[in-house]
Amino acid sequence: MDALTTPAERFDALPAFPWTARRWVGAATRGLAIAYLDKGPADADRAFLCLHGNPSWGYLYRKMLPVFLASGARVVAPDLIGFGRSDKPVLDVDHSFDFHRGALLEFIDALDLHHVTLVVQDWGGLFGLTLPMEMPERFDRVLLMNTAFATGEVTEGFRAWRAFSNSRPDLDVGALFRRSEPTLSAVEVAAYDAPFPDARYKAALRAFPNLVPDGADSPGAAVSRAAQAWFGSAWRGQSFMAIGMKDPVMGEPAMQALRRSIPGCPEPMRVHAGGHFVQEHGGSIAEAALASWGGR
């Protein structure tokens, strides 16, 4: 698989993000490297696994990571292949639901994560929520933000986003973040642009909107329905939900539907100033989640 790696200097001096990434290659990644953060004690009694979506990367969790680390936990934040500091396939068609899901399953096994709190937003949840049923002994909690089960049903808001994305093969990532979170500084916007020097690096950005299952037989839909059913019948872990209320695609209606699929999920934290990328308000979300779980 032909791929590009974003030059390391584009990630120099990232604001509020001092962590150096590790790189991992597994059988499921087809020779490509996943860049990831692995911080905190390796032998901690619990771990936070933070999964981002499109078109972001681990930088989106910069306000949540310090809160999780301060609790004494191990904290792991991978960049999906095609994003952040991970390798980037050149061809749009190299991306598939099963490819990314399989890479995450192998990654979790390789790092031997236990007592995991799964922290997800956007595609982090579309992939991530299908993982616990495959390895239930590893997962204890979920922290849900502006995401969904990818069961094959999509909203008109999503269809509008997909049409917008498909009309922009060289998507201006920084402009998208500025529109969603107007308080971002110029250097923060530049950090979201950093992984993508030009259109050659943006195959994942072009592919992902078209990977969202939009029919019952779409790739990923069946496993997502199975995951939804598993949560409904077998999940006994704790949960916390935060909603970026300004999200036009995965806002409160979508999140309330998700909440109904997670037994015991409490009333959500509503972040009225937050949009789709609600982790930009993540410090208070992480603190509230930990408080609801007794500070751990």
Task: Please provide the spans of the model-predicted regions.
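Active-site loop/oxyanion-hole signature of alpha/beta-hydrolase fold enzymes
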Residues: 24, 29, 37, 70, ...
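Catalytic histidine-centered segment of alpha/beta-hydrolase-like enzymes
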Residues: 274-284
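The conserved beta1-alpha1 loop
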Residues: 49-53, 121, 243
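Helix-rich cap/lid subdomain of alpha/beta-hydrolase
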Residues: 151-208
